[in-house]
Amino acid sequence: MALSKDDVLNAIAEMSVMDIVELISAMEEKFGVTAAVAAAPAAAGPAAAAAEEKDEFDVVLASFGEKKVGVIKAVREATGLGLKEAKDLVESAPAPIKEGVNKAEAEELKKKLEEAGATVELK
């Protein structure tokens, strides 16, 4: 009469920890295997990261340059902020202007801000 899986599991559940350790050692010897955890695969290298192109970007104002007023106007247009909020945002550079936007919108916003005199980064 062969034991079912449930019978084996119930027998193991009733064993002490020392008995289970001995059982594992005996299984390793009998089957020529080890119960050690396999090493995790290495993280993907830069080539794999480059293959996965981002689809969401954060537009970050790095600095406002010499044309602060023009940059404030461009930030107001892009974000819909009021004058004071846009001014505070520009003066707190580096600061995120928009977060989680698609590539086309991020590139367009970067172009507008750079035309206004700002230094912009896409992250």
UniProtKB/Swiss-Prot annotation:
InterPro entries: Ribosomal_bL12 (IPR000206), Ribosomal_bL12_C (IPR013823), Ribosomal_bL12_C/ClpS-like (IPR014719), Ribosomal_bL12_oligo (IPR008932), Ribosomal_bL12_oligo_N_sf (IPR036235)
Keywords: Ribonucleoprotein, Ribosomal protein
Keyword Nucleotidyltransferase appears in the UniProt entry: no
UniProt-recorded Gene Ontology molecular function terms: mRNA binding; structural constituent of ribosome
Pfam families, per the entry: Ribosomal_L12, Ribosomal_L12_N
Signal peptide coordinates: none
Keyword Ribonucleoprotein set for record: yes
Recorded GO CC terms: cytosolic large ribosomal subunit
GO process terms (BP): translation
Gene3D superfamilies named in the record: 3.30.1390.10, Single helix bin (1.20.5.710)
Subunit structure: Homodimer. Part of the ribosomal stalk of the 50S ribosomal subunit. Forms a multimeric L10(L12)X complex, where L10 forms an elongated spine to which 2 to 4 L12 dimers bind in a sequential fashion. Binds GTP-bound translation factors.
UniProt similarity note: Belongs to the bacterial ribosomal protein bL12 family.
Functional description taken from the UniProt entry: Forms part of the ribosomal stalk which helps the ribosome interact with GTP-bound translation factors. Is thus essential for accurate translation.
Protein name in the entry: Large ribosomal subunit protein bL12
Source organism of the structure: Psychrobacter cryohalolentis (strain ATCC BAA-1226 / DSM 17306 / VKM B-2378 / K5)
Gene (UniProt): rplL
